[in-house]
């Protein structure tokens, strides 16, 4: 709840104070002092509110108030205090005994302000008018900072691709195979960063038969599948490498340089070999 009003506004007088009301207020304060302004009007027999009685006493009926116009000394003191304190009229009135804050404010707006303008002084800043106007013009206009969100996008350079043409020729054949290889160069490889010892280069090597054909100029005749397994019995192999005769449990070969080793069961010390028919599974 807010503060209750100081008096009943329906039964109070408004407007200018009469001489009789002034005499009653002065007589009561001289006899009893100021006291509480809320209860003073009823005790003094006045149909006024407490605020009205207080302002009437402070601004007009106090015995220490100065009557009459302001002197030149008071004018200069008000100008000096205003340059230091600004529009704080209650503080200025405290330095001028016998003058009220309301009286000083009215006197400033009606007389002293006009006096300063005639002297060429700005009443607000207390500086020469030309200097104050020049300082206001020289002040740069403060622009509101514009916030911009910048997004930096960096594109990695495209990997360089190098092409190499290679041709492979096989002896005994007139055909040539041309191979086109691509090589990519990347600036950064995340796999190499994690595993520096890992080699990811891919190479294409020639077949074993081609290496044997090209190696040291030697010509060798490959063996057929049956001959390599030793499954020829008393027959001439088509490759012409060897002839195998199986007699009983032993096998004799006409050419043992290549070895008749079926499933790795040949004896290296002797020339007698085990036949694959006489093996028993254990």
Swiss-Prot record:
Coiled coil: none annotated. Residues 130-145 have a biased composition (Polar residues). Disruption phenotype: Defects lead to a better tolerance of UV-B irradiation due to the increase in sinapate ester accumulation. Gene3D superfamilies: Homeodomain-like. Residues 119-145 are annotated as: Disordered. GO terms for cellular component: nucleus. Keywords: DNA-binding, Nucleus, Repeat, Repressor, Transcription, Transcription regulation. Residues 37-61, 89-112 bind DNA. Its main location: nucleus. One of its GO terms (biological process) is negative regulation of DNA-templated transcription. Widely expressed at low level. Highly expressed in siliques. Weakly expressed in seedlings, young and mature leaves, cauline leaves, stems, flower buds and roots. Induction: Down-regulated by exposure to UV-B light. Pfam families: Myb_DNA-binding (PF00249). InterPro entries: Homeodomain-like_sf, Myb_dom, Myb_TF_plants, SANT/Myb. Residues 9-61, 62-116 form the HTH myb-type domain. It is found in: Nucleus. Disulfide bonds: none annotated. One of its GO terms (molecular function) is transcription cis-regulatory region binding. Transcription repressor involved in regulation of protection against UV. Mediates transcriptional repression of CYP73A5, the gene encoding trans-cinnamate 4-monooxygenase, thereby regulating the accumulation of the UV-protectant compound sinapoylmalate. Interacts with BHLH12/MYC1 and BHLH42/TT8. Interacts with SAD2. PANTHER family: TRANSCRIPTION FACTOR MYB8-RELATED-RELATED, TRANSCRIPTION REPRESSOR MYB4. This is Transcription repressor MYB4. The lineage of its organism: Eukaryota, Viridiplantae, Streptophyta, Embryophyta, Tracheophyta.
């Amino acid at each position: 709840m807010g503060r209750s009003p100081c008096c009943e506004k329906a039964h109070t007088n408004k407007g200018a104070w009469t001489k009789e009301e002034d005499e009653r207020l002065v007589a009561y304060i001289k006899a009893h002092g100021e006291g509480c302004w809320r209860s003073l009007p009823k005790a003094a027999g006045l149909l006024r509110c407490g605020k009205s009685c207080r302002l009437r006493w402070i601004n007009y009926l106090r015995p220490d108030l100065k009557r009459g116009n302001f002197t030149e000394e008071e004018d200069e003191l008000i100008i000096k205090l205003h340059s230091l304190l600004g529009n704080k009229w209650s503080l200025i009135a405290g330095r001028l005994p016998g003058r009220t804050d309301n009286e000083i404010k009215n006197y400033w707006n009606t007389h002293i302000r006009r006096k300063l303008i005639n002297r060429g002084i700005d009443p607000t800043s207390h500086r020469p008018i030309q200097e104050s106007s020049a300082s206001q013009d020289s002040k740069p206009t403060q622009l509101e900072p514009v916030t911009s969100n910048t997004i930096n996008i960096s594109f990695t350079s495209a990997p360089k691709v190098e092409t190499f043409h290679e041709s492979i020729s096989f002896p005994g054949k007139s055909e040539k195979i041309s191979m086109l290889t691509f090589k990519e160069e990347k600036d950064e490889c995340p796999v190499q960063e994690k595993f520096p010892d890992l080699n990811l280069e891919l190479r294409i090597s020639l077949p074993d038969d081609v290496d044997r054909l090209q190696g040291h100029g030697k010509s060798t005749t490959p063996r057929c599948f049956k001959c390599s397994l030793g499954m020829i019995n008393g027959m001439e192999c088509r490759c012409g490498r060897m002839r195998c005769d199986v007699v009983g449990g032993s096998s004799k070969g006409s050419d043992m340089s290549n070895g008749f080793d079926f499933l790795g069961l040949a004896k290296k010390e002797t020339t007698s070999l085990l036949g694959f028919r006489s093996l028993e599974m254990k």
